[in-house]
Amino acid sequence: MDPGLKPSSSWTHKIVDSIIANRSQTAVQNFRRQPLANKLTALEDAIVQPRKDSTPDSIAAILQELVSMGALKPSEVGPMFSDLLIRVHKYNSTNVQSNLNVLLGDIRAAQSEAIRSTNVGELSNQVILNDFLSRLPPVVPMGQHNYEAFKQSLRLMVNEAPNVTLFKSGPDTMMQVNIRGVNTVNLNSAFSNLQNLWGVVLDSDRVPGSISSKLSSNTRVLLLFLAPFTNENTFTPDTFLWQIMQLYRETVAASIEAPLETEREVAETVRDMGGDIDDVGRTMAYLLKNKEEVMANPRTLSPRQLGVVRYVQESLMDRIDRNGEEPIDALRNIVFSFAPSYFEANGSFIRKLLSYLEVALRNSPNYFREIYSNKYWTPPPSFWTQNYGDFFVEREAEAEREALEEAGPRESYSFLEDPSSSPQSSKIQSLGTCGMTMLRPMSPSVPPTPSVRSAPPSVSYGGPSRSSLSVDSASNRNFGATLARAVLPSAAAAIGNAAGEALYPSLGQFLAPAASLAATRFLSGNRGERIKRQRQRRRAEIERRRIAELTPPSPAPSLSSESSAPSLSSVRTSYTPLAGAKYWNPVDDPEGDRDVSGTGLGNPFDYLRPRNGLK
């Protein structure tokens, strides 16, 4: 070793002394003659000291104790010590445990460093919010669903809003929101203020001032901040919290429901190219979801609204099917069945429901009957959007035929014996003499022109008119039938109940409905036969109408002095519409407007037609 080289430190001097003892020349020569592997092993042992492990000593002590007790033979100790040492070192040695502990420490240090390098604010918000929610009671006396939904809405706001900070101020948890200034809310105070309001149920669409006045300003600010993170299905319908959050959502709707810039740019581009943005939306919906229409978020009825719907259905079924009232009269008179206080509290929904039913009745009688006869019916999306295109698909002829079948025994069947006396056939004949075909009924209130002589419809030469007698007799029959249908089923039910109770207790509740049903069927009589005959007459009338359309009109007879006076049937009666009324001209407009009033004039519900202009 060069005497000029000196150890750079005491640690180096110590390592060299452990390899070459006393630094003698003999020791240096001996180390030099060693193989390279021995030199490397000596250096490794000197630089990296092996960890002390007491596992072999522990195993040897255990085996020695077993030999001294006579449980093991001395010849068995060697192989057993070897196997145990290998197994312990492989699976459960102190060396392995120490290495694992070191590895876990390194992982914890790396995780802590990664967390410290991320957003500390969001992490602290989660820690503080979890601590606050863990201190709240898990169960409340009433309104558990609203209680849990409110906590989830608060967590959603803390997770999603970037300008929210939570911090502790003594025993209270504070939430600071930076929106148009700094707003601080005390969460402990807000939850304490709401503890008695979670399950409050309202019986109207308005929030009583006696309840809303209990909200503190701190709580109102929290409700305003949480409103954008809720929807109509978050809380239980008809509860105070559901109603007040709906008001706050409407307050902030202008700022949170603004269309996105991308959607606005696409809409402007489509309009500039002359396209329809609605068609583009339906096309995109079909490409993305394989559906042509983009359905809005489903809206569910509250228990109070569902009760209104079921009550209206039962009332319509009782008025139309049992009492024999006309559907339009039943709809107009059903509002008198509600108590004034109840109608005042729920008037907006009742008026909306009745308006929907009236439009359905005028445009699709089949759909109207399905509405009031199906006890599981709930309003479709068109009820909320006021786009009534879902029941405009029924054709007018089908609607008229089904409406005629639905009327059944309530109408006069005097014209079934003579089809020429029916009002519809007389209108078609009068229109055929004028030289044009018009399938829509004319208005009975339109008078003939004074220049043309025509006889009154109720006057007939040689005796009273058959139509006048049929009208009088039909009105009397309808009145008697209506009175019988209104009284006899109830009386039969009462008699059946009394007879059943007299025979056996609690038997009356089964006999009463059966007696009422039997009386109703007895009063209906041969309604099926009458409807069948009416269908046949209707079919024959349609065939005659088609034949009349294919047959060219006969020329009008020339009037001369030698000819006799023309008969009333040969006189061409012309009709003029009332002043200011919109009249349908089949020449200018072959399709015409949908006549739902039966007057031949304009459609009074034209403003309810969808924007795409369904016929």
Curated annotation (Swiss-Prot):
Ranges where the record places region Peripentonal hexon-tethering domain: 1-92
Main location: virion
Induction of expression: Expressed in the late phase of the viral replicative cycle.
Example of a GO cellular component annotation carried by this entry: viral capsid, decoration
This protein's UniProt keywords: Capsid decoration protein, Capsid protein, Host nucleus, Late protein, Phosphoprotein, Viral genome packaging, Viral release from host cell, Virion
Residues with the Phosphoserine modification: S212, S451
Sites annotated Cleavage: L601, G602
Biased composition annotated in UniProt, kind: Basic and acidic residues: 400-409, 539-548
Chain residue ranges for the region called Binding to hexon-linking protein: 124-238
PTM-bearing positions, type Phosphothreonine: T262
Composition-biased stretches (Low complexity): 419-430, 451-460, 557-570
PTM (free text): Cleaved near the C-terminus by the viral protease during virion maturation to form the mature protein.
Chain positions listed as propeptide in the UniProt record: 602-615
UniProt subcellular location: Virion; Host nucleus
Disordered: annotated span: 400-473, 528-615
Subunit structure: Interacts with hexon proteins; this interaction tethers the peripentonal hexons to hexons situated in the facet. Interacts with the penton protein (via N-terminus). Interacts with packaging protein 3; this interaction is required to promote correct genome packaging.
Protein family membership: Belongs to the adenoviridae hexon-linking protein IIIa family.
More info: All late proteins expressed from the major late promoter are produced by alternative splicing and alternative polyadenylation of the same gene giving rise to non-overlapping ORFs. A leader sequence is present in the N-terminus of all these mRNAs and is recognized by the viral shutoff protein to provide expression although conventional translation via ribosome scanning from the cap has been shut off in the host cell.
Functional note: Structural component of the virion that acts as a cement protein on the capsid exterior which mediates the interactions between the hexons, including the peripentonal hexons, and reaches all the way to the penton vertices. Two hexon linking proteins IIIa, one from each facet, stabilize the unique edge interface between a pair of facets. As the virus enters the host cell, hexon linking proteins IIIa are shed concomitant with virion acidification in the endosome.
Protein's name in the database: Pre-hexon-linking protein IIIa
Originating species: Snake adenovirus serotype 1
